[in-house]
C-alpha cells in the first residue's frame, strides 16, 4: 500500500487536508473534460495506487489496485482534465497471504461472479465538470468524474484529503479521503442483497471503501 506519508515528502507550495469518510452517490455519466495530451503530465505508476476494502458479516478484506496509465492536464497550477486507468489483473489482496486464501480471493474477484476481468480488464476514471478555463488545483476539495467498471459508466464526486505541489519541478500529489461506492450501481451482483433475497448471513456488503494517492512524474 502506498503510504500517505509519501505525500508529505514533497515541498508544498499549495496544500489542503481534512479527514473523514463519505458515501458516494452515483449518477448518469456526463461528457468528460477535454485535455491537451501534449501538455498533460504523466501519472507516476510506481508511486500511485488505489486502496480498496470490502465487507461481509464478521469480517473484511482489503488490498490495492495499481495505476496502469493516466495523465493530468495541469498548466501553471490550473487543472483542465485528466484520466486514470487501473488494470484489474494487478489487483492485490493484502490481509490474506497467497497460500492462505489470498490467491483464491483474487481469482474470485476477477471472475464472472464479480468484475469479469477477462471481459472488462480495465477500470477507468475520467474527470468531468471542469470549465474550459480550468480550475485552480490548490482550491479543489473534490473531484467529479465518470467511473467505468465493467460495462457501466457512472458519474461520482470524490472528496479530497490533500493536494501537494513541488514548485521546483511542477510535481503534484493528490490524495482522496476514504469514500464508499455501491457496487450494485455497476452491476456487480455476487452476494448482493440488491439483487438476491434469502441470503441470510451469506451476503457481501454492497459498499466498497476506496481511497487513492496519485502522484505525477
What is each PLM-predicted segment?
Residues 1-12:
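Sec-dependent bacterial lipoprotein signal peptides
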Residues 14-217:
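Low-complexity, acidic/polar, glycine-enriched regions of mature
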Amino acid at each position: 500500500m502506498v503510504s500517505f506519508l509519501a505525500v508529505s515528502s514533497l515541498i508544498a507550495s499549495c496544500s489542503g487536508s481534512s479527514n473523514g469518510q463519505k458515501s458516494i452517490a452515483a449518477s448518469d455519466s456526463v461528457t468528460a473534460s477535454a485535455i491537451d495530451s501534449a501538455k498533460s503530465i504523466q501519472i507516476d505508476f510506481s508511486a500511485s495506487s488505489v486502496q480498496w476494502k470490502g465487507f461481509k458479516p464478521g469480517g473484511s478484506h482489503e488490498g490495492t489496485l495499481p495505476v496502469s496509465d493516466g495523465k493530468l492536464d495541469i498548466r501553471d497550477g490550473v487543472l483542465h482534465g485528466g484520466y486514470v486507468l487501473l488494470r484489474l489483473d494487478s489487483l492485490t489482496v493484502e490481509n490474506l497471504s497467497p497460500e492462505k486464501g489470498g490467491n483464491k480471493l483474487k481469482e474470485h474477484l476477477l471472475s464472472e461472479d464479480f468484475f469479469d476481468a477477462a471481459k472488462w480488464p480495465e477500470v477507468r476514471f475520467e474527470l468531468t465538470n471542469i470549465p474550459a478555463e480550468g480550475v485552480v488545483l490548490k482550491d479543489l476539495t473534490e473531484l467529479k468524474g465518470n467511473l467505468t467498471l465493467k460495462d457501466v459508466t457512472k458519474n461520482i464526486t470524490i472528496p479530497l484529503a490533500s493536494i501537494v505541489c513541488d514548485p521546483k519541478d511542477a510535481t503534484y500529489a493528490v490524495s482522496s479521503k476514504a469514500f464508499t461506492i455501491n457496487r450494485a450501481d455497476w452491476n456487480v451482483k455476487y452476494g448482493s442483497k440488491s439483487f438476491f433475497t434469502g441470503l441470510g448471513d451469506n451476503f457481501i456488503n454492497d459498499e466498497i471503501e476506496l481511497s487513492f494517492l496519485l502522484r505525477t512524474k
